[in-house]
Curated annotation (Swiss-Prot):
Protein source organism: Methanopyrus kandleri (strain AV19 / DSM 6324 / JCM 9639 / NBRC 100938)
Function, as annotated: Involved in protein export. The function of the beta subunit is unknown, but it may be involved in stabilization of the trimeric complex.
An individual GO BP term: protein transport
Ranges annotated as spanning the membrane: 34-53
Localization per Swiss-Prot or TrEMBL: Cell membrane
The protein's name in its UniProt record: Preprotein translocase subunit SecG
Cytoplasmic side stretches: 1-33
Keyword terms of this UniProt record: Cell membrane, Membrane, Protein transport, Translocation, Transmembrane, Transmembrane helix, Transport
Gene: secG
Extracellular topological intervals: 54-57
Amino acid sequence: MGKKMEKKRAEMPPARAGILSFWDEEAPGIKIDPDYILYACFAVAVLLIIAHTMAAV
């Protein structure tokens, strides 16, 4: 999979390639699964809905 990522990264502007390095197995440091980002956004949305409901009551 590493080779595919390298090829994709070569075709991208540098900023996007830097963001994608989070997902690459070979990247050192923090490993972030894209699914967790989705779950985090969903959790924030639910919390905002709850907060608005509480404020309205």
